Amino acid sequence: MKTKIITRRDFLRVAAVSPVAGAIASYQNKSSSKDIAKQPVSQAGTGKIRVVLIRDENALAGFKKPNEEVVDRMLDEAMASLFDVSDPVQAWKDIVGPTDIVGVKSNVWRYLPTTREIEGIIKKRILDAGVSEESVGVDDRGVRRDPLFQKATAIINVRPGRTHDWSGIGGCIKNPIMFSPSPPDYHPDSCADLATLWDHHNLRDRVKLNILLMLSPQFHSTGPHSY
């Protein structure tokens, strides 16, 4: 099957009209997608970013409540496609393994959180990849104080997509802002320097996977904390 190349503009346009969707991305410098996991983000400046968009009309069991069985299958299909393998567990093994300490950087904003269901689905696959239970943690606002995240060798970055009064959009670039000792430092000029956050806290090397949830995205707000 011929691969279709989409631009960032194409991706954002499709995602904007796909409320029951998710997008996962990793980074590569080589032509083979199987090399993705071997390329840390810090080496991806002039390389390629591989993005998989997946949708299912049954992804929600209710208002803002994920259908775990469906989303579990969606994530498996997306990971297999992203890493060009038939077994989704093998895809996870390409980015984490028994020697890793893995932090899942979630988002707990009460109006539109990542949800415990999604966090559980991701954690299950991390464990399936051979990471021990005590070496997996999930956190958001406490990542700087969390001993596991301080030692984490791999980070899975996951959050819902939503509008944001300062940055325009709250997505995967913004999600690690809680690693900063002073998040407001990134707010001036519509968060113009937000991407520089990734130059600190070893994020470029430690973040192995970005998952943007578009199951119930927020497209409009009237203030910094509105919903």
Predicted features along the sequence, with ranges:
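N-terminal and secondary-structure boundary signal
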Residues: 1-227
